[in-house]
Every structure is written in structure tokens, then in C-alpha cells.
Amino acid sequence: MAVYSRAYDEKFPVVCMDEKPVQFFEEARKSFRSEHTGICYEDNEYIRNGTCSIFLFTEPLRGWRYADAQERRRKADWAKQIDWLLTVQYPDAEKVVLVMDNLNTHTIGSLYETFPPEHAFALANRLEILYTPRHGSWLNIAEIELSALGRQCIGTQRIPDLETLKNLLVPWATDRNLKQRGVSWHFSTDDARTKLRRLYPVLQV
């Protein structure tokens, strides 16, 4: 939580990252819209068409976010997202402070398994990784952005494939970035010590 209280510094941006699985569904029967009422009718039957993973990055203090969908969430997929983040989005940053969940793919080792040692070292040297606690993923602001993405971009519609999803993600992120939609985070370390006091160890003297 203390990292969210840091002043904005473009050389050391605080970026939050999270992932979201998405299932693809094709319509068993084509939907249609009534000419009289304008209501769209969908058949309850659908065909499962695989899954994918959304990778989302957000820099709360800048009001920026980026979402991309990939077929899988392997170590190499995460590593390639980090490579893009550092070389394309933040080429001039000295070090990116990256807040994320402690998943088995979210490690420096994933960089070395994906890229040549020299490039992996260069990427790792520009990262300051902060993992959220095991049961504290809600501390990751990227979860808030994923929630907004779910409501505003995906909703209840049936998405048939990866290309369709990618075509939805780009305008959603672009619109929120243009409107500078940020996150107002007020839960501080002092708040945690008060409201979550039962989770802190008690020193016996």
C-alpha cells in the first residue's frame, strides 16, 4: 500500500498488472433483431470455442491502461508482455515498479526461459517487483481495471474468438485513456493497521 502513496515519477512509474481468463462461445443459432421492437433475440444454446487470457497493465497516477489477449498464459506469454512494457511503453524509465499477484509465471526466471541471457538481464534490471500477499490480491489496482473491463467491454455478450476480443479491448482502453480515467486509492498502511489489526502478529514481551 505504501507504494501507492509515492509521488509520480516518470523515471520510476508504478504499474499494476493482472490477468483474466475469458471463455469463447459461438452461437448455435444465429441471433436476430426484431424489426418492430428492436429487441435482439439470442438462442440459449451455444458452442464452447476455447479460452484465452487477458493481460492488463495500468499506471494509476497517469490514468493509463493497456489490455491484450493471448491464447495462453504461459511463462513465455508473460515474459513477452513484460518485454513490450519495458521496451515499447517505458523505454526511458530507469526502473518500473511492477505490482502483481505471485503466480508461478510471474517471475524473473520466465524472462530467462524466454529470451537470451543478456536481454533477460537487461529487462530484469529495470524491474522492481512487488507481489501482493497470498490472500490480498484486492490490493492490486489492476483488479479494479479488470472489473471495469468486464462491465464496460465484455459484459454479457458472447465472444466467439480471440480476434473479436482484441477488437473490443483496443477501443475500450483507448477511450479510458483519452478520458484519463484514474483510480482514487485511499486505503493507506495506517488504515490497514487499524482495520486489519487482527491479521498483524502480536509481540509477546
Regions found by a protein language model. Name each.
Residues 1-83, 196:
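Extended, low-complexity cationic-aromatic segments
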Residues 11-12, 62, 93-95, 123-128:
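Short glycine-/polar-rich loops that comprise or flank the Walker A/P-loop
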Residues 16-18, 57, 63, 82, ...:
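Mobile genetic element proteins and their domesticated derivatives, centered on retroelements
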Residues 28, 164-205:
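C-terminal domain-tail junction helix/linker
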Residues 41-46, 119-141, 157-159:
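RNase H-like polynucleotidyl transferase catalytic core
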Residues 76-97:
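Short, basic/hydrophobic alpha-helical segments
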Residues 93-107:
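Acidic/histidine-rich, metal-coordinating catalytic segments
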Residues 142-162, 175-179:
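Active-site proximal helix-loop segment of RNase H-like, two-metal nucleases, encompassing DDE(D)
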